[in-house]
Curated annotation (Swiss-Prot):
Subunit organization: Homotetramer.
Stretches for region Required for tetramer assembly: 548-560
Region (Disordered): 541-560
Gene3D superfamilies attached to this UniProt entry: HAD superfamily/HAD-like (3.40.50.1000)
Entry function: Broad specificity cytosolic 5'-nucleotidase that catalyzes the dephosphorylation of 6-hydroxypurine nucleoside 5'-monophosphates. In addition, possesses a phosphotransferase activity by which it can transfer a phosphate from a donor nucleoside monophosphate to an acceptor nucleoside, preferably inosine, deoxyinosine and guanosine. Has the highest activities for IMP and GMP followed by dIMP, dGMP and XMP. Could also catalyze the transfer of phosphates from pyrimidine monophosphates but with lower efficiency.
Residues that bear Phosphoserine: S418, S502, S511, S527
Family as reported in the entry's similarity comment: Belongs to the 5'(3')-deoxyribonucleotidase family.
Annotated protein name in UniProt: Cytosolic purine 5'-nucleotidase
């Protein structure tokens, strides 16, 4: 007779006796199928699944799509007067990464941590460090809130732009026709600041996306530029069985229709053998021209789209939700009203950490799932180059050994220079495994600004939302403990606090004999007055009082 898990967990002490030690190891799915958790989320509480389209439902192939955007932007710059030589540049995917900051004053690309400390600094293709860096950044630090000067290149659409900025700065710095200055460059009596150059690039990128031929060239060759996954119809059909599904994209209807038709263009439906269905049938609500992040605030007028012409019908839509109708504009409040859902009922899935994740989290309280396509490469390096990580751990052990028997009375100064050089070399090798700018999430042991934003705003994240296919809709995504250094570096061994020298070490915060304390207080106060405060001391809670990030709703549990 087998024992159920619930029976075993009635008495925690019985669990090891009923299981072999191998069974106690936590089961984890394949790394490339995993969904990673920052804040616990119970899937059975999600009533609506929301999607962005670009780089979420429709993942653009890299580097083909970035190369196309890069070429079109360069052509636009040349058409407005930039040098013809720029047409010789080709997109190099090994250089840029997301989350870099462009300094519009000095023309530098910066990789920073959450607090603005510099991790990497590049002027064009030249990586600068040491005294050269301190001339422009005396404390190796930037004020991130100075948005007039510092621009964060956070999206996947920013990758071609990031590399183009490096190309331009390098060209104008090194081309003999131009005189390089600290804040720009000169051509005779003409001066161009890096700020002006940056604005030209921003305008060119916007022109390519909204007025140029980027979308036209994309739909002309969808197989070349868009990833098509046969598991997409299956996952969305399963989501629709347990809740409502909506699409909210900034793209217009004509482009959305062509992309989505391609993504769902299979001879069968959700499963082999089932009949083919149009892409619209997988959604309860379709909303285009969303204009995120404005969409998560005041939004825009909600209008109806004529799906035959792609044009908008006149007037504001004020009716109830109707299946088969495509809407334009609106706001996140509109979605909640039409679907009959409130903030935490909705899991919104997108790739844009600001436009999709931050705003939906801060303004609406929606649960958030961030799609990070680069995570596949990050996991590959993490697993394939494990020897580098292991060597760093070994070097830390060697370093600790040198100081093992030394305290403040020691005059001995161990020579750690060779270990330090090796640590720097191994750390550099590790960084270069990700690309010239290193990992999206860290430089050495320090986390990047992008990593801190992911941890702060994304409840869940993965390389692809398709990974949800490998979890049941009753799953509890439980966040792992985030350990501080005094927890991650100290073994779970007994320490006698009475032997510690700290004056607070013997302060017992776990239990107090309240009855004895009450008696003593009563002896002291009874002669003064028979009147006592209603409560002389707090009682130790007998039930759970702390929020443990288990996505629990106490009121709902009580109602049940």
């Amino acid at each position: 007779m087998t024992t159920s898990w619930s029976d075993r967990l009635q008495n925690a002490a019985d669990v090891p006796a009923n299981m072999d030690k191998h069974a106690l190891k936590k089961y984890r799915r394949e790394a490339y199928h995993r969904v990673f958790v920052n804040r616990s989320l119970a899937m059975e509480k999600i009533k609506c699944f929301g999607f962005d389209m670009d780089y979420t439902l429709a993942v653009y192939k890299s580097p083909e799509y970035e190369s196309l955007g890069f070429e079109l932007t360069v052509e636009r710059l040349v058409s407005i007067g930039y040098p013809q030589e720029l047409l010789s540049f080709a997109y190099d995917s090994t250089f840029p990464t997301r989350g870099l900051v462009f300094d519009t004053l000095y023309g530098n690309l910066l990789k920073v941590d959450a607090y603005g400390n510099l991790l990497v600094c590049a002027h064009g293709f030249n990586f600068i460090r040491g005294p050269e860096t301190r001339e422009q950044y005396p404390n190796k630090f930037i004020q991130r809130d100075d948005t007039e000067r510092f621009y964060i290149l956070n999206t996947l659409f920013n990758l071609p732009e990031t590399y183009l900025l490096a190309c331009l700065v390098d060209f104008f710095t090194n081309c003999p026709r131009y005189t390089s200055c600290d804040t720009g460059f000169k051509d005779g009596d003409l001066f161009m600041s890096y700020r002006s150059m940056f604005q030209d690039v921003r305008d060119a990128v916007d022109w390519v996306h909204y007025k140029g031929s980027l979308k036209e060239k994309t739909v002309e060759n969808l197989e070349k530029y868009v990833v098509k996954d046969g598991k997409l119809p299956l996952l969305l059909s399963r989501m629709k069985e347990v809740g409502k599904v909506f699409l909210a994209t900034n793209s217009d209807y004509k482009y959305t229709d062509k992309i989505m038709t391609y993504l769902f263009d299979f001879p069968h439906g959700p499963k082999p053998g089932s009949s083919h269905r149009p892409w619209q049938s997988y959604f309860d609500l379709i909303l285009v021209d969303a204009r995120k992040p404005l969409f998560f605030g005041e939004g825009t007028v909600l209008r109806q789209v004529d799906t035959k012409t792609g044009k908008l019908k006149i007037g504001t839509y004020t009716g109830p939700l109707q299946h088969g109708i495509v809407y334009s504009g609106g706001s996140s409040d509109t979605i909640c009203d039409l679907l009959g859902a409130k903030g935490k009922d909705i899991l919104y899935i997108g790739d844009h950490i600001f436009g999709d994740i931050l705003k939906s989290k801060k303004r609406q309280g929606w649960r958030t799932f961030l799609v990070i396509p680069e995570l596949a490469q990050e996991l590959h390096v993490w697993t394939d180059k494990s020897s580098l990580f292991e060597e760093l751990q070994s070097l830390d052990i060697f370093l600790a050994e040198l100081y093992k028997h030394l305290d403040s009375s020691s005059n001995e100064r161990p020579d750690i220079s060779s270990i330090q050089r090796r640590i720097k070399k191994v750390t550099h090798d590790m960084d270069m495994c990700y690309g010239m700018m290193g990992s999206l999430f860290r430089s050495g042991s320090r986390q990047t600004l992008f990593a801190s934003q992911v941890m702060r705003y994304a409840d869940l994240y993965a390389a692809s939302f398709i990974n949800l296919l490998y979890y049941p809709f009753s799953y509890l995504f439980r966040a792992a403990h985030v350990l501080m250094p005094h927890e991650s570096t100290v073994e779970h061994t007994h320490v006698d606090i009475n032997e510690m020298e700290s004056p607070l070490a013997t302060r017992n915060r776990t239990s107090v004999d309240f009855k004895d304390t009450d008696y003593k207080r009563h002896q002291l106060t009874r002669s003064i007055s028979e009147i006592k405060p209603p409560n002389l001391f707090p009682l130790a809670p007998q039930e759970i009082t702390h929020c443990h990030d288990e996505d629990d709703d106490e009121e709902e549990e009580e109602e049940e």
